[in-house]
Amino acid sequence: MVQRWLYSTNAKDIAVLYFMLAIFSGMAGTAMSLIIRLELAAPGSQYLHGNSQLFNVLVVGHAVLMIFCAPFRLIYHCIEVLIDKHISVYSINENFTVSFWFWLLVVTYMVFRYVNHMAYPVGANSTGTMACHKSAGVKQPAQGKNCPMARLTNSCKECLGFSLTPSHLGIVIHAYVLEEEVHELTKNESLALSKSWHLEGCTSSNGKLRNTGLSERGNPGDNGVFMVPKFNLNKVRYFSTLSKLNARKEDSLAYLTKINTTDFSELNKLMENNHNKTETINTRILKLMSDIRMLLIAYNKIKSKKGNMSKGSNNITLDGINISYLNKLSKDINTNMFKFSPVRRVEIPKTSGGFRPLSVGNPREKIVQESMRMMLEIIYNNSFSYYSHGFRPNLSCLTAIIQCKNYMQYCNWFIKVDLNKCFDTIPHNMLINVLNERIKDKGFMDLLYKLLRAGYVDKNNNYHNTTLGIPQGSVVSPILCNIFLDKLDKYLENKFENEFNTGNMSNRGRNPIYNSLSSKIYRCKLLSEKLKLIRLRDHYQRNMGSDKSFKRAYFVRYADDIIIGVMGSHNDCKNILNDINNFLKENLGMSINMDKSVIKHSKEGVSFLGYDVKVTPWEKRPYRMIKKGDNFIRVRHHTSLVVNAPIRSIVMKLNKHGYCSHGILGKPRGVGRLIHEEMKTILMHYLAVGRGIMNYYRLATNFTTLRGRITYILFYSCCLTLARKFKLNTVKKVILKFGKVLVDPHSKVSFSIDDFKIRHKMNMTDSNYTPDEILDRYKYMLPRSLSLFSGICQICGSKHDLEVHHVRTLNNAANKIKDDYLLGRMIKMNRKQITICKTCHFKVHQGKYNGPGL
C-alpha cells in the first residue's frame, strides 16, 4: 500500500494523493491560523507565554501551508484528473517522491529569499515578533497616524473587505515600501517627492532598512523590520516620529519658551465631551496625556509627596529630573517606546491580621501614571455613582459617613460587604473590556496593559509575572478600581430603585403589638396600670420594622468598603448579599468573602471606615409631650444615625505606639524616642497626633468624650517626655516650669486644648466639577511647574543644564542648617525641591559642596 501511494506513476493515484495532501495542508493551516488569532486577540502574550520563536514558526508555517501546499496540490490534482497524466518537471514517469521534494525546495527557497523571521527577547512587555518582508525598499518617514501591522495573514483585508486577524494598530518609526508603490502613493496623495528622497538610505544599507522596534502593541524590539503591504499604502505616515534622530539637542530654556501655557483646547474638548455624559467614545488619549504640559502638571502634583522619594526596583528617584527627561518621556510615550519597570513588592501588616502586599513603583514612572490618572478622571469621574466616595475629588471618608447619616437613620438591618482581595483579583481582560467601552485608543490601552503586566520584584529580588489584579500603591490603581466597581454601583442602584424598593412611607403597616398596647392604655382606668403599659409600649416601634408592603435599601461605597442599610427582613438581607456575590462572579470575576461579610441589626451596628455605625434603639430615643385636644400625648423624636468613634481601639493604638500603657486603661507614659528632639519639635509632634485623630473623627457622636480621653493621654505623655528630657522627674515640676499649656520659651509653641477643637461643619462639595474649573486649575499649576525648570541655578546662577534637587523631608534642626548649607537653605525657603545646574548637583551628591564659595 505504501509503495503504491509513494512510488506509483499512475496519474489517478497521484491525483488522489495530491488531493489528500491539499486537504491535510488546509486543515493544518486553519489550525495555525486559529492559534495566531487567539494569541493576537488581546494585548500581551496570551497562550504562547511570550515564546516568540514558536509564534514565528506558526506564522511562517501557516503561510507555507495556505499559500503553497494547499492550493498548489489542489491545482495539481485538478490537472491530473483532467488530462489523466502525471506531469513532472523532469519527466513524465517521475514518481511522487521526486515531485514532492522539488516543490518543497521551491517553497524553502521562497521562504529564505523573501521572508525574514526574527526572535526578540521576551520580557514583561514583549509579545514576540512576526514574519516580516525583507525586500529592498525605500525609507518613508512616519508620523501622526496609526499604521496597521503588516502580516501574511491579513493581506485579504482591503481586497475582500474583511480581515482574517484582529486589526492591531501601532506606531512605527519608518515604513519601507517598494519604489514603484511609493510613486503610486505620492501620486494619489498629491505629494511632490524627489527621486533622491525615495532612494535615501537604500544604497548604504543594501535596501534592508530597519526601524528601532515593532509597532505591534507598542513593544520595542531589537532592530526590527517593518514592511507595508501594497493594500495598506494609503495608511502610511509621512513624517518621522523621532525627530531627535536627525535634530541637534535643543537648549532647555529655548524649549521651555515654546510651551504654550494658555491653550488647552484639546483638553477642553475632552472635558466637554465627557461632562455629564456616560456614552462618549474617546480617542487620541495617548497623544493628549503624553503632551509635555500634562507631564509637567503631573510632576507638579507628585513631586512633594513623601512616597515619591522611595526607590523602586531600579533605584531611581525624582532627584535630578530635568526638562530634557520630560521631553524624551513625552516622545517615548507617543511612539509606544515607553515601558514600565517591575514594581518592588513589600508587605505591610493589617489591623485584622496578616499582611497586605504593597507595590513601590519607580517614582519617575509615577509621572506617567499621574498623567494617565488625570485622563481617566476627566473621562469617568462625572459618570461615577452618587454613592461612590473613594479616591474622588472633593469626596472622602467623611462625606461617605455623612451620606450614611442622611439615608440610613431608619434602617433596621446593616450589611457590611467585604470583597475578597479586591485589588489583587481584578481580571485584566475584564478591566480592559470595561475601559474599551469608552476609550478607543490602542496606544493608551497598550500603555495601560504594560502597567498591569509589568510584574513585581520580591524582597529576595526575584521577578514575578502579574496576570491578575492591579498593584496596590500605584497612582492609577484607585481610579481603575473605581471604574471597574462602577459596574457594581450601577447594578445596586438599578436593583434597589427598580426591584427592591416598594411601597410608600405614608402607607407603612402599623405594628400590631403597638396598636394593641395603645388600645389597652386607652381603656385602662388605673393610673398605675396605665403607666406600666406605657413603659411596655415604649419598647416597640409604631410602624412595622419588616413590612412586606414597604421596603427600602441604600448603599455607600468607599473603594472596596461597602455598607448597605436595609428596611426589610433578615431574609431580604441574605438575598441581597447572595445576589451581589453572584453578580460579582458572573460579570466581574470577583467574589465576596462570606466569612467577613456580616448582617447585623441596626441596634448592634457595624464598623465602617473606622466608625461604629448604629441606630438608637426605640426605647432610648428622647420624646416630647404635645397637647392633642384636652389630653397630652408623648411623641418620640426621630434621631439621626449614631456614628461613634471606637475610643477603646484608638487608645490601644496609642498604647501600641508608646504614648500610654495598661491596655485600654490608657495610662500616659513618656516617649523615649523623642527626648533628644527640641521642645518645639516634641510639642508639634503631640499636637499633630492629636489633631489627626480629632480631624478624622470630628463627625463622631461621642466626639466630646473622645477629645477628653485623647487630650488627657497626649498631654500627660508630653509632660512625662519633657520631664525625662530636662530631668525634672515629675509632671508637677514640668507644669511649674513651662506652665499649664507647656509653652516653649523660644518658639512660643504651646500644648493648648483649644488646638483640638475641630469644627463639625463639613463642606459637602459636589464631586462633579465643570471643565472650566479643571482648566483654571491646570492653567494655575502649569506656570508653577515650568518655574522649576526655567529659572537659574540657586548656587552658581547658571541657566543651562538645570535639574531639580529633591530631599525626602525638611528637618528644622539647627545642626542640619549648620552642617549642610544647601539643605539649610531649602529649609529656610520651606521647599523640598530646588533648581540647580548639573555640575553643582553632582558636587552636592558627591559631598563636595558646603556653601556658595564653590
Curated annotation (Swiss-Prot):
TM segment ranges: none
GO BP terms, alphabetized: aerobic respiration; homing of group II introns; intron homing; mRNA processing
Any Pfam family matching the protein: RVT_1
GO cellular-component term (any): membrane
Domain annotation Reverse transcriptase: ranges: 329-613
InterPro entries found in the cross-reference section: AI2M-like_HNH (IPR049030), Cyt_c_oxase-like_su1_dom (IPR023616), Cyt_c_oxase-like_su1_sf (IPR036927), Cyt_C_Oxase_1 (IPR000883), DNA/RNA_pol_sf (IPR043502), Domain_X (IPR024937), HNH_nuc (IPR003615), RT_dom (IPR000477)
Any one GO MF annotation of this record: cytochrome-c oxidase activity
Record keyword Mitochondrion present: yes
CDD domains xref list: HNHc, RT_G2_intron
Compartment(s): Mitochondrion
Assigned keywords, A-Z: Mitochondrion
Miscellaneous comment: This protein is coded in group-II intron 2 of OXI3 (COX1).
Protein name, per record: Putative COX1/OXI3 intron 2 protein
